Amino acid sequence: VTGVQTCALPILVIIISFNLPFLMEEYGLSSGRAGILISLFFLAIMAPGFVLNKIVQVLGRRIYMVCLLMIACGMGIILLSRSEILIALGCILNGLSYGIIQPLIYDKTSDVAVPHKVTLALAFVMAMNYVAILLCPFIVDAFQNLFHSHSQTFAFWLNLMVALMGMFIVMKQEKLSL
């Protein structure tokens, strides 16, 4: 797990809490209901913790590939749907994926860190996580300006593409196939 992966993961999914109300407004849906959908997203982040060992056991080496595919599918559902129910499904898929991968990053960090520096290593991972969340709107805005886009869908398309690229990179590194 690299620093880039640690930073990229929260940016991929946190866009839901930043941009979903604006996207729903652009779709002609109630932006006020976005709070409920964002709550479902955060609830879904927590849920895998109850069965994480079983998920890891079932998915094995494919876990990162599957989670990145779920993020891409969730973003796609959010983008293509004008239904709050389906947007909720997209939010849940993203939350579940993040809820699976994030603990694995912390676990891997504690495994690879020198024993007397584990706390420091975990602190760095946590700091990178929050720096990524802090920088997310600026990064997305920079890409939006670069591509001259003014649509609220841009951030979701960008993250869908990054998730797919990440999935293919993982597949190549792990020598996996769909």
Where are the regions a protein language model picked out?
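A late C-terminal transmembrane helix in Major Facilitator Superfamily
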Residues: 110-148
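Helical-face signature of the major facilitator-like transporter fold
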Residues: 10, 83-95
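Short, small-residue-biased leader/transition segments that mark boundaries at the very start
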Residues: 2-9
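Short amphipathic helix-loop junctions that connect adjacent transmembrane helices
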Residues: 18-33
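Helix-to-loop junctions at the C-terminal end of transmembrane segments
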Residues: 47-60, 144-145
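Intracellular juxtamembrane helix-capping segments at the cytosolic ends
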Residues: 100-113
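A membrane-interface helix-boundary motif in multi-pass transporters
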Residues: 140-162
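Structural signature of the two symmetry-related core transmembrane helices
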Residues: 62-77
